[in-house]
């Protein structure tokens, strides 16, 4: 098969998944073309067999115009035309789309071409943007307008930022160009989002569930001197990990915990920044983004409990990474986050039930009901290898 993979980034969670799938397909004898725009972060990484959909200048100009008009569909025609020509020259058999938002492609033009050619398309729902007229997550604000028309969008100034509320128009365009595509298959990493997709304008589309997976060879129980280096011997370590910290990821919950838990506890947050540090109490140990995954595995291993009080989530790989390192998980019942946890490896409490979360922290760190072995056993059901094999199986099915 000749497979084209398209994503906004070649790094981060979705970018890593895209590259993992690409590497797996190549190892299985398939040809893969990985496509993404020329952003600062993307240009830092050399990716084999890749194609830059647009230049930085094209993206910056289109981004400014899109923000001020709210008409993401009107721009990036030339980059999309070049992408289509590249796919035709490549001899594409199937297209795997990840994140299309982010100012780099003209989605009506792309889907019009894919529909006309009857090319099998797999679209992985890394967030809720494919279902809405604008936002990437509606769970945190309790908005249900995506089920009808997205008129009067309450978050149109949020990512992808716009100065004009054009959400209703963009949702109509998605209905026009995407709904009813016979060769389209949606893949959700969680049962939660698959259910929501079935309630959207995409109901009737073939919807599958393929859980995200992690590298269990990297994320495994890892002995280190982390506790002694940080002066945390004998402490009950609560750990949180996120790409971007804020209220959606429960930063305020950790701040509150720091003010209420006694000195037996230590709180560590990974993935912070100088800006986040300004609002943190001294009790919270802040570790900025680490690119060393083995170092991260050592931090997961050193923790007594991984706490994920997220308010908007799809299927968080951080939960799986913690389990793979033998650390139990405590999470809010948000999105697909609870699907990672079963009774052998952690606990789930109602979303925003702070008192229940705190009570579970005290219980789990005192009773220690979850063994490291049972945590890792659960994580081994959600590996990168299984995820990639499931995607290869699906692509073969659609092409054949």
PLM-predicted stretches and their roles:
Residues 187, 231-249, 255-258:
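Conserved donor-binding/catalytic core segment of Leloir-type glycosyltransferases
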Residues 195-198, 214-229, 278-279:
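Acidic anion/phosphate-binding donor-loop and adjacent secondary structure
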Residues 271-297:
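Nucleotide-activated donor-binding/catalytic signature segment of Leloir-type glycosyltransferases, i.e.
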Residues 298-303, 391:
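Short alpha-helical donor nucleotide-sugar binding micro-motif in glycosyltransferases
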Residues 311:
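Aromatic "clamp/platform" in nucleotide-sugar-dependent glycosyltransferases that forms part
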Residues 328-331:
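Short hydrophobic beta-strand element within catalytic cores of glycosyltransferases
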Residues 343, 347-354, 363-368:
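Conserved acidic donor-binding segment of nucleotide-sugar-dependent glycosyltransferases
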Residues 369-397:
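A charged, aromatic-enriched C-terminal amphipathic alpha-helix characteristic of glycosyltransferases
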């Amino acid at each position: 098969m000749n497979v084209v993979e398209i994503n906004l980034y070649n790094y981060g969670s979705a970018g890593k998944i895209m590259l993992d799938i690409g590497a797996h397909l190549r190892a299985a004898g398939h040809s893969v073309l990985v496509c993404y725009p020329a952003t600062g972060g993307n240009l830092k990484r050399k990716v084999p067999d890749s194609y830059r959909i647009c230049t930085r200048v094209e993206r910056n100009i289109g981004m400014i115009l899109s923000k001020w008009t709210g008409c993401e569909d009107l721009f990036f025609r030339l980059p999309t035309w070049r992408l289509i020509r590249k796919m035709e020259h490549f001899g594409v058999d199937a297209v795997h789309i990840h994140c299309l938002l982010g100012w780099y492609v003209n989605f009506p033009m792309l889907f019009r071409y894919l529909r006309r050619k009857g090319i099998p398309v797999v679209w992985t729902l890394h967030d809720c943007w494919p279902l809405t007229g604008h936002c990437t997550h509606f769970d945190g604000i309790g908005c249900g307008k995506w089920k009808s028309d997205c008129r009067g969008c309450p978050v149109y100034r949020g990512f992808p930022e716009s100065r004009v509320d054009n959400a209703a128009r963009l949702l109509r365009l998605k209905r026009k160009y995407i709904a009813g595509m016979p060769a389209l298959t949606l893949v959700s990493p969680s049962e939660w989002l698959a259910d929501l997709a079935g309630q959207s304008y995409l109901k009737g589309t073939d919807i599958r569930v393929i859980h995200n997976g992690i590298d269990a060879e990297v994320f495994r129980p890892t002995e280190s001197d982390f506790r002694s280096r940080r002066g945390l011997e004998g402490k009950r370590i609560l750990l949180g990990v996120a790409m971007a910290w804020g209220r959606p990821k429960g930063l305020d919950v950790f701040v509150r915990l720091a003010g209420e838990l006694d000195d037996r506890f230590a709180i560590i947050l990974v993935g912070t920044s100088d800006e986040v540090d300004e609002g943190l109490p001294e009790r919270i140990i802040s570790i900025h983004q680490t690119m060393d995954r083995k170092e991260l595995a050592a931090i997961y291993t050193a923790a007594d409990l991984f706490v994920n009080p997220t308010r908007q989530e799809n299927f968080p790989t951080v939960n799986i990474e913690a389990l793979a390192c033998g650390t139990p998980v405590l999470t809010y019942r948000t999105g697909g986050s609870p699907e990672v946890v079963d009774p052998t490896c952690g606990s789930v409490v109602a979303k925003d039930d702070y008192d229940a979360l705190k009570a579970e922290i005290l219980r789990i760190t005192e009773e220690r009901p979850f063994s490291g072995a049972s945590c890792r056993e659960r994580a081994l059901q959600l590996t990168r290898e299984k995820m990639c094999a499931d995607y290869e199986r699906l692509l073969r099915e659609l092409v054949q």
